[in-house]
Amino acid sequence: MGKKYTESVKLVDKNTLYTVQEAIELVTKTSKAKFDETVELAVRLGVDPRHADQQVRGAVVLPHGTGKTVRVLVFAKGDKVNEAQEAGADFVGAEELVEKIQKENWFDFDVVVATPDMMGVVGRLGRVLGPKGLMPNPKSGTVTFDVAKAIADIKAGKVEYRVDKTAIIHVPIGKSSFGEEKLSDNFHVLMEAVVKAKPAAAKGQYIKSVAISSTMGPGIKINPGKVLE
C-alpha cells in the first residue's frame, strides 16, 4: 500500500457510519492521487436479483454530470442518422458498425443508443454488448426514436444504475475536484432515484448499506437510514 493511501485510511474510521455530508467531506480529503479521482457510490440493496420482480435498474441525469467525457454510439437509419449526428453522437451507423464490432473487437464508445427498428440488428451483438453493460435498453432510455434527447441526456451526465448479482449498485457521482456541494447534489439525486425504484416485491430493509470512495481512496460508510437527509 502506498504512503498516501495509508494516510487516507487514518482519516476514516471503518466502524463509523457517517452522515452524507461528513462522508463527502472525507472523500474529498482522502482523494490524494495526482489525477482527478472519480468518486463512486456503492449501495447494497435488500433485494434478490435472481428474481425478475426484484431487479433494480434505471437512469438519472446528475445535476453536475460525472466529469467524464462520454462517447455515444447510435444505431439508426434514415432521418435519424442526421438527427443523431446533429445532436452530437460520436458514431452513427447500422450494419457496418455491427460488423466493425464483431470483426475488429471495436469498443471505442461508452454508451449505445438504438432506435427500436434497429434492435433486430443490434440484437446480434447481445453476447458482446451484454456482459459489458452496453446493450441498449428501453428502461434506461437508450432504445428510443427520440435520439436527440437520449444523446443530450447522456452528454449532460446521465448515469445508468443496475443492481448486480450481489445486490449492489455501483455508480460514479462525479470527480473529487467537484467539491462537496456538487458531489452532495449528485449523491442525493441518485439516491432518490434508487429509493423510488424499489420493487414492490422487495421485503424488509431496502437500503442495506451505503459507501462512497474515490478511485484510490478507502471506502467511507454512510448511515443507510440518513441517505435522504
From Swiss-Prot:
GO terms for cellular component: large ribosomal subunit. Transmembrane segments: none annotated. Gene3D superfamilies: 3.30.190.20, 3.40.50.790. Keywords: Repressor, Ribonucleoprotein, Ribosomal protein, RNA-binding, rRNA-binding, Translation regulation, tRNA-binding. SUPFAM superfamilies: Ribosomal protein L1. Part of the 50S ribosomal subunit. This is Large ribosomal subunit protein uL1. It comes from Clostridium botulinum (strain Hall / ATCC 3502 / NCTC 13319 / Type A). The gene is rplA.
